[in-house]
């Protein structure tokens, strides 16, 4: 029986692509383990999936000054030793890393044990963790074809993004019942990320009188961001977040308004949903969402509205443009084959 160790964490985006791949490896009888941090989100997610989970020490990798930068290198070193010992006991055939600060000790621990290491990078340019890990890896899979120019040619493989199978199996009838919507108006689903997005939430709510004339709205507004005054608004349903219902909601969705995190937008792409993307500004991030959004716009998958340009009028204008050019967006979206990503990655895992 072949063995694999997965790693990746710090945010859900560094875990969910692993969850897309794991079921296929289970079908092929791989022995699967996961190494992550003691208290990261990856621990909560993976333990629900009935996968052996091992914790190691980890320190955050920062690009800015913080007093914790003095302590964290020692935590990383401790994490490398933890990972080295654990990997030596597990004896995997390959390690697959999705990035995030916890992945660096695991990658180095694997390299020290002479285990082949494969990386996956979701964004247009590699994050700090993958930049460090790359020197210890044999291959790096990229989600965006343009990302290849930032990486060593001999290591890079373009795959697209692995998308969880359950996301593709939504039921429209269940969504209609859950939301209390009719079939008469198109549905817009608005997502601002797990914590929400204050400016998006406020602008959407200001624009509701105009939007609800033509559309029904599902608003995933983030923890603590519900507006009690809108709870019984006809054609408008708001949630802090949804879990099992999300595939059904996406099945009934005609257009998506969203941030431009790579994993989410590739799920929308695979589902062929035209998008209005409002990326995190470069002042609130390293600018990766802007690059992601602009790539999708160039390929005809999405329209981009920059956060500093978000107003009620600009939001309504962009929604109307999506609706007016719906067929053109659909034609572009059909060109993408999302199923190839998982099969390509599994092939290289098996060959490692």
Swiss-Prot record:
GO terms for biological process: carbohydrate metabolic process; cell division; cell wall organization; lipid glycosylation; peptidoglycan biosynthetic process; regulation of cell shape. It is an enzyme of class 2 (transferase). UDP-N-acetyl-alpha-D-glucosamine binds at residues 11-13, 164, 194, 289. It catalyses: di-trans,octa-cis-undecaprenyl diphospho-N-acetyl-alpha-D-muramoyl-L-alanyl-D-glutamyl-meso-2,6-diaminopimeloyl-D-alanyl-D-alanine + UDP-N-acetyl-alpha-D-glucosamine = di-trans,octa-cis-undecaprenyl diphospho-[N-acetyl-alpha-D-glucosaminyl-(1->4)]-N-acetyl-alpha-D-muramoyl-L-alanyl-D-glutamyl-meso-2,6-diaminopimeloyl-D-alanyl-D-alanine + UDP + H(+). Keywords: Cell cycle, Cell division, Cell membrane, Cell shape, Cell wall biogenesis/degradation, Glycosyltransferase, Membrane, Peptidoglycan synthesis, Transferase. GO terms for cellular component: plasma membrane. SUPFAM superfamilies: UDP-Glycosyltransferase/glycogen phosphorylase. Belongs to the glycosyltransferase 28 family. MurG subfamily. Cell wall formation. Catalyzes the transfer of a GlcNAc subunit on undecaprenyl-pyrophosphoryl-MurNAc-pentapeptide (lipid intermediate I) to form undecaprenyl-pyrophosphoryl-MurNAc-(pentapeptide)GlcNAc (lipid intermediate II). This is UDP-N-acetylglucosamine--N-acetylmuramyl-(pentapeptide) pyrophosphoryl-undecaprenol N-acetylglucosamine transferase 2. It comes from Bacillus cereus (strain ZK / E33L). The lineage of its organism: Bacteria, Bacillati, Bacillota, Bacilli, Bacillales.
